[in-house]
């Protein structure tokens, strides 16, 4: 991507480019930081790079926004980094889906939105505020192009739509908690009549679980369908997040007396699990939320997030849900819609169209829980959040109990390592 950005800068002598990254990436993923640093240091002086550390300890900047000339913007779940490329087919052994070293990359499911007009301008305002907060520099609003910007080959799904922009921002310094995304999620769940459809990398947010649980307890409440990855990207992440997911699934299943709850992971034609990184909630055919926010506590009140939302009877909303599920099930959209019309139930439609041998959806089963996972789930050390009542702790991030528990976890790890060394040096006869 660096070579592409450099080429664009060379082609457009007046272009200024601003790259803003979370400062925690220096520690968490230093390799992903190097391309941006290289562009800034060795590239054009019109490429400006900054690290943003204005967040509580342990939090991160998770918004995924690209804006151009105040007139075009992307907002969604896709990071501008490696190993994110794939097609909707998620073909097995696709030679184009490779890592930097040439090794195969796993199938990846992600979603973003593109927009022009006032919505793009509002996202530009948000981005300039983020830059000013990080650097102290106020960027001028650029002149709007005479002609609208829209990439060739990108289909338009709707025109003249009213878009809401929702944020999560943790309390920090003199800033109070902003939990617009959580509030919109809860309002949408409460208003649902027929179906709540969710795609998310995680499924651990307590407030969302409580809201879904209340709807499943109702005699005539909505169906709830969740699409998640089968497993996390590391064993530690599995322990930190998917033990919590176990607990959420157990709670929802315990109140699901009408058999209206399902949680799946997608597979391709070779039965490879497709990693789900998309962040979407669609309620009935009237509300869609799409952006950077997962269904976890961090996204509700600890990290910075940005979603866009659309509300109202709109073909775009129903078509998006049909397109996503038709993709996961490996069928055409028309076939999916006809089956849904016949059943009038999303779960029944999935049951009929789901293939056990080809591309399809598989039920997520409870994972075994180890000691580390139980500690992380009990403390929510890796999935913490602020609530509106906790502004007094703004800027402190991890609480003292979390620091103590990190020390305990490190001690457990060291003891385990010493035991492993002892066993290697004293094998059983």
Where are these regions (language model features)?
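Charged, low-complexity intrinsically disordered terminal segments
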Residues: 1-429
């Amino acid at each position: 991507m660096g070579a592409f950005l450099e080429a664009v800068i060379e082609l457009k002598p007046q272009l200024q480019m601003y790259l803003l990254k979370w400062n925690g990436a220096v520690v968490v993923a230093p390799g992903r930081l190097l391309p941006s640093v290289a562009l800034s240091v060795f590239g054009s002086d019109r490429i400006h790079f900054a690290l943003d550390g204005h967040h509580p300890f342990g939090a991160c900047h998770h918004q995924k926004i690209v804006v151009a000339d105040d007139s075009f913007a992307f907002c969604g779940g896709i990071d501008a980094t490696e190993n994110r490329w794939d097609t909707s087919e998620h073909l097995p052994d696709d030679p184009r889906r490779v890592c930097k070293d040439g090794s195969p990359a796993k199938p990846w499911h992600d979603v973003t939105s593109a927009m022009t007009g006032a919505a793009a301008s509002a996202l530009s305002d948000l981005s300039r505020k983020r830059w000013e907060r990080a650097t102290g520099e106020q960027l001028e609003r650029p002149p709007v192009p005479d002609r609208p910007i829209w990439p060739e080959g990108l289909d338009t799904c709707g025109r003249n739509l009213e878009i809401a922009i929702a944020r999560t921002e943790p309390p920090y310094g003199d800033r109070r908690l902003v939990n617009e995304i959580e509030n919109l999620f809860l309002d949408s769940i409460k208003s649902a009549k027929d179906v709540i459809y969710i795609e998310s990398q995680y499924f651990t947010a307590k407030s969302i679980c409580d809201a879904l649980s209340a709807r499943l307890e109702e005699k005539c409440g909505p169906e709830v369908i969740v699409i998640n990855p089968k497993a996390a990207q590391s064993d530690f992440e599995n322990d930190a997040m998917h033990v919590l997911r176990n607990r959420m699934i157990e709670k929802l299943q315990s109140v699901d007396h009408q058999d209206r709850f399902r949680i799946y992971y997608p597979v391709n034609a070779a039965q490879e699990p497709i990693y789900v990184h998309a962040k979407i909630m669609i309620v009935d055919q009237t509300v869609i939320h799409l952006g950077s926010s997962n269904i976890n506590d961090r996204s509700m009140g600890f990290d910075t997030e940005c979603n866009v939302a659309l509300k109202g009877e709109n073909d775009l909303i129903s078509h998006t849900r049909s397109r996503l599920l038709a993709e996961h099930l490996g069928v055409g959209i028309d076939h999916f819609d006809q089956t849904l019309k016949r059943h009038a139930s999303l779960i029944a439609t999935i049951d009929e169209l789901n293939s056990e041998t080809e591309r399809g959806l598989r039920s997520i089963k409870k994972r075994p829980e180890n000691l580390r996972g139980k500690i992380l789930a009990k403390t929510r050390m890796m999935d913490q959040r602020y609530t509106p009542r906790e502004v007094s702790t703004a800027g402190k991030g991890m609480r003292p109990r979390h620091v103590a528990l990190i020390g305990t976890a490190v001690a457990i790890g060291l003891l385990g390592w010493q035991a492993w060394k002892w066993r290697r040096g004293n094998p059983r006869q």
